[in-house]
């Protein structure tokens, strides 16, 4: 006789309830969080503007059906597109992530919480334009900053103790979950509707990390977050219609996320949701490089200057040794052919070789015309990594959150340079005072890529005046970015 199926519908999983209660009820009071969110907004938009320089990104942008213009549609920064919020979220999200130059969160799971700005900004602009058309008040940029802080917190707090990469899943699933929650709240959904929306995000089949690792590394890693944040807007809009949710999306035996995708394990949590993640997020300021390599690139730049002072060049190098942390080795320690820019910006040997050869590392250095220089692969072959357990421990320490790398150069004449150690990149919370002026410079450079001088100045006047920016309607701010 077969066992009967228990068809009593459970309460929503506690993990889902905690997310929803946080987005609905938690008041952000941290000045540091808002200060950081302000600069995060500017940096993230700037990253999107730089991506417009690359045809591989631009070809994916615009409406699904060419020529479609949506009434009261979202303005995509740096373009003339006017899109529905779902497709706009994809456009903005793909731009943001394309060059791997936006913010980073490193823990048991890695990720880029500002990826959520795709869904947040698209939803806020769409709501604002429709509100104005109906004679109602638009959303303000302060509401965008609040949504950013909360999306960062959801994605980052889940990532602290839970490794999705170890089960082959891509971190963009956390973008989908975080964006769904904050977008649903922005749309004015009820608590029950937001619970439904978040459960729908967990029930989705989640992206695999296939496209982030050899031998399949490819450009999907540059648009995967855009795909996730746009899916979030879609799910939130579905929930707004009254579409049902799935209370035990995580915990259902056999069919829930834990049993299907997480080896039967439940999530662990280090801290309740607050504003910790935005306060401690990492900015990529100096180099468009996968974050586990940022300090290695900084060390390589220092060594390049030392080589110049000593009258040496990369041709004189016999051996390069990188002392690093475990996550770096697992993600970007790569030998063999590199097939495309996405492959190259996830290879620490490539990202160290370029500054040792040329004294720079820019997004253009991942392109084919640079990579064909035979000296790069020759130097890559001389670069080896090994794990320092102390670096790994500091990486996981919540009070340190170091991303340390140390490089030693040995030369063909038998000499060597003293090891250069960099524990914290310039985008780290411990180096905010050094980093923020450079972050603003990065934003100015990216504005200059797309806009004439007068338009750049109009954007800067508002963007750098925090009080004025916070009060500005979202639609008016995005209008500044239309070409």
From Swiss-Prot:
Database matches in SUPFAM superfamilies: 2-methylcitrate dehydratase PrpD (SSF103378)
One Pfam assignment: MmgE_PrpD_C
Record keyword Lyase present: yes
Keywords: Lyase, Tricarboxylic acid cycle
Biological processes, Gene Ontology terms: propionate metabolic process, methylcitrate cycle; tricarboxylic acid cycle
Induction: By propionate, but not acetate or glucose. Expression of prpBCDE operon is regulated by PrpR, CRP and a variety of sugars such as arabinose, galactose, glucose mannose and xylose.
InterPro entries registered for this protein in UniProt: 2Me_IsoCit_deHydtase_PrpD, MmgE/PrpD_sf, MmgE/PrpD_sf_1, MmgE/PrpD_sf_2, MmgE_PrpD, MmgE_PrpD_C, MmgE_PrpD_N
Keyword Lyase: yes
Quaternary structure, from the entry: Monomer.
Role played: Involved in the catabolism of short chain fatty acids (SCFA) via the tricarboxylic acid (TCA)(acetyl degradation route) and via the 2-methylcitrate cycle I (propionate degradation route). Catalyzes the dehydration of 2-methylcitrate (2-MC) to yield the cis isomer of 2-methyl-aconitate. It is also able to catalyze the dehydration of citrate and the hydration of cis-aconitate at a lower rate. Due to its broad substrate specificity, it seems to be responsible for the residual aconitase activity of the acnAB-null mutant.
Protein name: 2-methylcitrate dehydratase
Gene name in the database record: prpD
């Amino acid at each position: 006789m077969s066992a009967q199926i228990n068809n009593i519908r459970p309460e929503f999983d506690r993990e889902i309830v905690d997310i929803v209660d946080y987005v609905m009820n938690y008041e952000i009071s941290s000045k540091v969080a808002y200060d950081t969110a302000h600069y995060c907004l500017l940096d993230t938009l700037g990253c999107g503007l730089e991506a417009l320089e690359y045809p591989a990104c631009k070809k994916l942008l615009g409406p699904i059906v060419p020529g479609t213009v949506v009434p009261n549609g979202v303005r995509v920064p740096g373009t003339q597109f006017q899109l529905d919020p779902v497709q706009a979220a994809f456009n903005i999200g793909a731009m943001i992530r394309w060059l791997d130059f936006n913010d980073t969160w490193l823990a048991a799971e890695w990720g880029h919480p500002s990826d959520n700005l795709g869904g947040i900004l698209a939803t806020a602009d769409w709501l604002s334009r429709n509100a104005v058309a109906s004679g109602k008040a638009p959303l303000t940029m302060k509401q965008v900053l609040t949504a950013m802080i909360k999306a960062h917190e959801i994605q980052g707090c889940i990532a602290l103790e839970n490794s999705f990469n170890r089960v082959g899943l891509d971190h963009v699933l956390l973008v989908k979950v975080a964006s769904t929650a904050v977008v649903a709240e922005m749309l004015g959904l009820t608590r029950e509707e937001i619970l439904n929306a978040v459960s729908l995000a967990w029930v989705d089949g989640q992206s695999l990390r296939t496209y982030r690792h050899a031998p399949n590394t490819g450009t999907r890693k540059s648009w995967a977050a855009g795909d996730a944040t746009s899916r979030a807007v879609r799910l939130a809009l579905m929930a707004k219609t009254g579409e049902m949710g799935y209370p035990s999306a995580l915990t259902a035996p056999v069919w829930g996320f834990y049993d299907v995708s997480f080896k039967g394990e439940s999530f662990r949590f280090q801290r309740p949701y607050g504003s910790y993640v935005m306060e401690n997020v990492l900015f990529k300021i100096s180099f468009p490089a996968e974050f586990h390599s940022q300090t290695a690139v900084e060390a390589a730049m220092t060594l390049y200057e030392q080589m110049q002072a000593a009258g040496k060049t990369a041709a004189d190098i016999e051996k390069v040794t990188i002392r690093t942390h475990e996550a770096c080795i697992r993600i970007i320690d790569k030998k063999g052919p590199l097939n495309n820019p996405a492959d190259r910006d996830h290879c620490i040997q490539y990202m160290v070789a370029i500054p040792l050869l040329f004294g720079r590392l820019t997004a253009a250095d991942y392109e084919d015309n640079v990579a064909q220089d035979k000296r790069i692969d020759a130097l890559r072959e001389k670069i080896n990594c090994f794990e320092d357990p102390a670096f790994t421990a500091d990486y996981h320490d919540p009070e340190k959150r170091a991303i340390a790398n140390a490089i030693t150069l040995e030369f063909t004449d038998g000499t060597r340079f003293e090891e250069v150690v960099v524990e914290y990149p310039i985008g780290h919370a411990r180096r905010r005072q050094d980093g923020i002026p450079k972050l603003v410079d990065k934003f100015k450079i990216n504005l200059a890529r797309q806009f004439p001088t007068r338009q750049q100045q109009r954007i800067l006047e508002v963007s750098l005046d925090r009080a004025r920016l916070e009060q500005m309607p979202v639609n008016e701010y995005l209008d500044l970015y239309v070409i």
